[in-house]
Swiss-Prot record:
The keyword Glycoprotein does not apply. This is Cytochrome c oxidase subunit 2. It is found in: Mitochondrion inner membrane. GO terms for molecular function: copper ion binding; cytochrome-c oxidase activity. Cu cation A1 binds at H161, C196, C200, M207. It comes from Alligator mississippiensis (American alligator).
């Protein structure tokens, strides 16, 4: 997760986030090359070594400044379309979790199991165990298995919310009366933090998201305990 001096993206913890980081670096390199060319041309025009009193039509130059931007746009569009496709791809999810945003907490419903649903509230600072993160810990975490394709259906009960976990490259608006979906696949166990990313009222800053990914055999034990309780 991020630290106070962190200026870049969080470490990628999912294949989707790795793709997003690749696209970011790819686009940033193109932007750097374009900016370098523009600054060079500005510098060359400010301090010209040659002076031409007459201007003439140069067909080759017009072809270059027409074709070159087209090539740049295509080199950005193709990786972008690939990433968008991966974000919307649905491949036989092993588990479906419905997430509902409320003022100001989240509720989770494991739709494959009729009795498994719970609300997730932020733990107040005065009740926070030592070593836990302020404003990020919740009383009930969203539990998911590793190496499994998980479909998350996202909606809201009252106003607009946004379910976002930066380290796995997931951010989706929660809109009342509408179901949006994201796909999550995580290879390694861990705890991942996020927050509501849409201003939703007075306590917008106090509805964190905590997702814990555990091995499949541990997830099965957690399911049994949760359903029986």
């Amino acid at each position: 997760m991020a630290n106070p001096t962190h200026l870049g993206f969080q470490d990628a913890m999912s294949p989707l986030m790795e793709e997003l980081l690749y696209f970011h670096d790819h686009t940033l390199m193109i932007l750097f090359l374009i900016s370098s060319l523009v600054f060079y041309m500005i510098f060359a025009l400010l301090f010209p070594k040659l002076y031409y009193p007459n201007t003439s039509d140069v067909q080759e130059v017009e072809v270059i400044w027409t074709v070159l931007p087209a090539i740049v746009l295509i080199s950005i569009a193709l990786p972008s379309l690939r990433t968008l496709y991966l974000m919307d791809e649905t491949n036989n999810p092993c588990l479906t979790i419905k997430v509902t945003g409320h003022q100001w907490y989240w509720s989770y419903e494991y739709t494959d199991f009729s009795t498994l649903e719970f609300d997730s509230y932020m733990i107040p600072t005065q009740d926070l165990p030592q070593g836990h993160f302020r404003l990020l810990e919740v009383d009930h975490r969203m539990i998911t298995p590793t190496n499994s394709t998980i479909r998350v259906l996202i909606t809201a009960e009252d106003v607009l919310h946004s379910w976002a976990i930066p380290s796995i490259g997931t951010k989706m608006d929660a809109v009342p009366g509408r179901l949006n979906q994201v796909m999550i696949t995580l290879a390694n166990p861990g705890v991942f933090y996020g927050q509501c990313s849409e201003i939703c009222g007075a306590n917008h800053s106090f509805m964190p998201i905590t997702m814990e990914t555990i091995p499949l055999n541990h997830f099965q034990l957690w399911l049994e305990d949760s359903i029986l309780s």
